[in-house]
Amino acid sequence: LVDKKLVDEYNLDILSDAIDSERDLQFTYLGLQTLYDRYFIQSEDTKIELPQAFFMRVAMGLANNEENKEEKAIEFYRLLSSFDFMSSTPTLFNSATLRPQLSSCYLSTIPDDLRGIFDGITDDAMLSKFAGGLGNDWSRVRSMGTHIKGTNGKSQGIVPFLKVANDTAVAVNQGGKRKGAMCAYLETWHLDIEEFLDLRKNTGDDRRRTHDMNTANWIPDLFMKRVVEEKSWTLFS
């Protein structure tokens, strides 16, 4: 659960002496309940952390690469336990654990080939597993009806793949502690842009809807100039 190598590198007596249990009194009931429900390390169904030990564990992970580990860990601990500074949720979840993934968000571009698309979805699943939020640019993926050279067939466009990505984020939640978070991005010139804008609707074919995924349409200055000038806008794949 906790990185034993990291623990062995610290003088735990020094860190224990720095813990101030009186700081537990700064919590509201709701804050303490949230900490207990979502953030404490647990073994099976048993929580094995207390609030100040939790903050020290996070601080130890953050100070791991510092020259004077104990001094920096205590400095980080005091910042966290006083609420003067608070790390992001993945850092609080994972610092000093066997999977020290500390970043909140990961951005990627999905390539225009089948293997690359599913490699991207697999990467999303693994990142979500360890509490990472996800943002994928789908602009490179060809649109519906586009020729596929390898099979001499026609592409189904981005929407079916977005449905798979949406369901992956639902299936692989963030460390079992909160729902997966994913956002799909598409540029305004893409031929599938109109269907993309319908993804969150509650009507229509549910197989072409992504109710759990956020969507974002990248709009360049040129598009807005065309709108102001009442000119045409070209879509392509």
Residue ranges and their predicted role:
Residues 1-237:
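Extended catalytic cores of very large enzyme megasubunits
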